[in-house]
Regions:
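Lipid interaction determinants
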Residues: 13-75, 81-133
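Bacterial N-terminal signal peptides
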Residues: 2-10
Length: 133
């Protein structure tokens, strides 16, 4: 799927959401934010909803379990490195991994690499197998 975070590497914006006044999500707070929850994001015409299963499995909700054409499926793995301001979430879709800092801008989130926004305005929905609004 073209919308997965690993394929979203072109810079979406400048430095605005990868520094203050946004707050970097670090250490255990990063694991708490993602584990057992769904990240909802969009860029251009692509939209995705990735479920961060406890234990590290990463699922794309797509159109849900009941959809015969585009059901939810595992797309890779995720993990968190808790290291203060060097804390990152790493995604592996089977073709190599990508690591991102996550910045909280008041309830929407930016996924950043080297201070550059790759995905912005992402939201987190509580739970898995719930889809995004």
């Amino acid at each position: 799927m073209a919308g997965v975070l690993a394929l979203a590497c072109a810079a979406e914006g400048a430095f605005a959401a990868c520094n203050t006044p946004a707050t970097q999500v670090t250490d255990a707070a990063l694991t708490t934010l993602l584990s057992g929850n769904t990240v909802c994001a969009a860029r251009g015409g692509d939209r995705w909803q990735e479920e961060h299963q406890a234990g590290g499995a990463l699922w794309d909700y797509k159109l849900g379990d009941a959809d015969p054409v585009d059901p939810r499926t595992q797309v890779g793995t995720w993990s968190v490195t808790e290291a203060g301001t060097a804390s990152v979430v790493t995604y592996d879709y089977g073709t190599g991994s990508q690591s991102y800092e996550i910045w909280d801008d008041g309830g929407s989130y930016s996924f950043c690499q080297a201070g550059v926004v790759n995905v912005d305005n992402a939201t987190v929905v509580s739970g898995i197998n719930v889809g995004c609004p």
